[in-house]
Amino acid sequence: MKIATINVNGIREAVGRGFLDWLANQDADVVCVQNIKAKSFELDDSILYPEGYEGYFLDAEQDGFSGVGLYCRKIPKAIMYGLGFPQCDHEGRFLQADYDRFSIAS
């Protein structure tokens, strides 16, 4: 299994700089992304669901601030959005995908 991680410092800007091509060339099973700095409902499907991946995102409440995501080739058994602590979950900093034998967090 290949896992990659990247701080995109703004998903829209990263897409403009070739992020989707980078993603396609990684041949990773899971890609963790940090600092998406966007609300996922505002993103195009090409960003949410790039070819071969399902995208999962946890947005920050504050516009243009933090946020994390996971691009997964295989659909996880479960996704955990946040840690369950409202005082920190509003920043959109923890997203976990659970599989049969492991979990991965972004």
Predicted feature locations:
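N-terminal, active-site-proximal structural segment of metallo-dependent hydrolase catalytic domains
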Residues: 1-50, 65, 81
